[in-house]
Amino acid sequence: MYGINQRYLYISFHFFVVWCHAQGEKNHPSPNFKQYVREQGSLTDQLSRRQVRVYQLYSRTSGKHVQIRGHRVSATADDGNSYARLYVETDTFGSRVRIKGAESGRYLCMNRRGKLVGKPNGRGRDCIFTEIVLENNYTALENARHEGWFVAFTRKGRPIRASKTRQNQREVHFIKRLHKGPQPFPNAEQPKHFEFISFPSTRRAKRNRKHQTAS
């Protein structure tokens, strides 16, 4: 009888521990992984080395490439134009980037009214964009400061006010293309062929030749 009561108490205690553990899990909800990724992706990485990519942005509507000429931004550059070459610098571990014109040295930015402008300094959040790869394989660029505002151009290559843009519009769709012009750093130098350099023969080499002829 004593053994049965002891076993009953043991089983009851075991179920009590399991019940307490289940209640603890209910009180502590599982972490939101998507929210964590979103928060970490919105922080600027100040420690890691910047990764710089070089390409052109082909506008789906204008059929031309994005260019930054001083303060003005348009999508009217031909393929291979020096102003169409862009340096795309990573800002975080995610898909946030800064876009800089290789020829003008200006950054692609968006002001309070949603107008695209070129600025010499691209440290502000208005000069940071999130690359969004769409289902149709096009890329959309959403401004980091103004959520829901995208880079967009008309058929004539003129910038559209970002407050009137949506992700599913053709005007915000771009294709990344390699630049046909000369390669920037670190590929500025073209591959060189090996050159054979002739050195004058040393005294020891002359002695060896005399020894071979004598033998």
From Swiss-Prot:
It holds the Pfam family FGF. GO terms for molecular function: fibroblast growth factor receptor binding; growth factor activity; type 1 fibroblast growth factor receptor binding; type 2 fibroblast growth factor receptor binding. It comes from the Eukaryota. Residues 1-22 form the signal peptide. One of its GO terms (cellular component) is extracellular space. It is found in: Secreted. Glycans are attached at N137. One of its GO terms (biological process) is positive regulation of MAPK cascade. Keywords: Developmental protein, Differentiation, Glycoprotein, Growth factor, Mitogen, Neurogenesis, Secreted, Signal. InterPro entries: Fibroblast_GF_fam, IL1/FGF. Transmembrane segments: none annotated. Belongs to the heparin-binding growth factors family. Involved in dorsal-ventral embryonic patterning, by promoting expression of bone morphogenetic protein (BMP) antagonists such as chd. Also involved in anterior-posterior neural patterning and in mesoderm induction. This is Fibroblast growth factor 17. It comes from Danio rerio. The gene is fgf17.
